[in-house]
Each structure stands twice: as structure tokens, then as C-alpha cells.
Amino acid sequence: MQTEHVILLNAQGVPTGTLEKYAAHTADTLLHLAFSSWLFNAKGQLLVTRRALSKKAWPGMWTNSVCGHPQLGESNEEAVIRRCRYELGVEITPPESIYPDFRYRATDPNGIVENEVCPVFAARTTSALQINDDEVMDYQWCDLAAVLRGIDATPWAFSPWMVMQATNREARKRLSAFTQLK
């Protein structure tokens, strides 16, 4: 995969430039655009992934299905599709917005900061996973209700962005709609 960049944003969320992705994530990470996606299978189960140990931020942490950064000229939805192909090897239904104004800042145990305007999406797949080991070290298809109970009981076991997204009432409601079989 070619070198990725992040789109830097000012406090109002207006793009101000770009920076190479790896260089952007430091103890002083500037505000930038990202996305987060929750992927469901034909049985209505959620894909929960464990970040590879080689990841700069939150290595080895359980999180929602796919996260990433849109590139210049790419929509958030196109970025979700691209990263699902790259990280999971799957085709997905068109991503649906479930938490469009999500924004957060969090510091991992190594001091790396995430500082993102991060719209949240959900999608479905019927494809078999072809996991990219550089991105994902483990995964589980899970009942959404069980994952939400786990987040409520042990939030420290999940990425902070997943916890914040899952504890938003409207996002939970929209995620629950994806557990219904179509």
C-alpha cells in the first residue's frame, strides 16, 4: 500500500493541509480527519478486531472492525471501503453513517495521542475474511449485545474510541439495526 497521509483540520474541522500518517501520530498529534466502521455479517454479528502489535497506537487492543483516514479527494465512505479491502479482504455494502459528528482525543499507554474528527459508519459483508496480519492480530464475530455489555463492564479492555462510540445512545440504536437479518 502506498504511503498514507492524514488530512489536518483546524478547530472548526476545516482542512488545513496533510501530513504523513506515521509522522502525524505522536505525543502532540494535530487534529485530523479519520473514520471508524463497525462491520456486521449475514447473521447480524459484529466483527471485533484486535490491533496488530506492530501498530503505533494501541497495539494489541480490541476495537471495532476497521478504522482509518480518508485520503485527499476520497470520501469517508470510499475510505471505509478501501480499508475493509486492505485490512479484512472483504467487500461491503455501502457504509451508513451512524455517528457523523464523533470527535475525540485520547492518549495510549505509550504516550501516542489520537486527536480526530472521526465520523462513524456501519456496513455489512457476506465475504469470507482475508485478514491482513500487519493490521489485525485476532478477530471474533460477536453478538452486539454481548460486546456492549463487555464495554459497559470492562471499558479498559477496548479502544477508547470504540468505548466512546458504543456509549452514545443514538449510535447504539443505529448499530442495533444492523443486527437485524436482511
From Swiss-Prot:
Cofactor(s) for this UniProt protein: Mg(2+); Mn(2+)
- Assembly behavior: Homodimer.
A Gene Ontology biological process noted in the UniProt record is: isoprenoid biosynthetic process
Q: Which EC numbers does the record give?
A: 5.3.3.2
Q: Which organism is it from?
A: Escherichia coli O6:K15:H31 (strain 536 / UPEC)
Residue stretches spanning the membrane: none
Which positions are annotated as binding Mn(2+)?
A: 25, 32, 69, 114, 116
HAMAP family registered for this protein in UniProt = Idi
UniProt cross-references to SUPFAM superfamilies, sorted A to Z: Nudix (SSF55811)
Query: Briefly, what is this protein's role?
Result: Catalyzes the 1,3-allylic rearrangement of the homoallylic substrate isopentenyl (IPP) to its highly electrophilic allylic isomer, dimethylallyl diphosphate (DMAPP).
Instruction: Write out the residues that bind Mg(2+).
Output: 87
Which Pfam family, an example, fits this chain?
NUDIX
> What's its catalytic activity?
isopentenyl diphosphate = dimethylallyl diphosphate
Q: Which cellular component terms (GO) are annotated to the entry?
A: cytoplasm
InterPro entries xrefs: Idi_bact, IsopentenylPP_isomerase_typ1, NUDIX_hydrolase-like_dom_sf, NUDIX_hydrolase_dom
Read off the lineage from the record: Bacteria, Pseudomonadati, Pseudomonadota, Gammaproteobacteria, Enterobacterales
The name under which this protein is listed is Isopentenyl-diphosphate Delta-isomerase
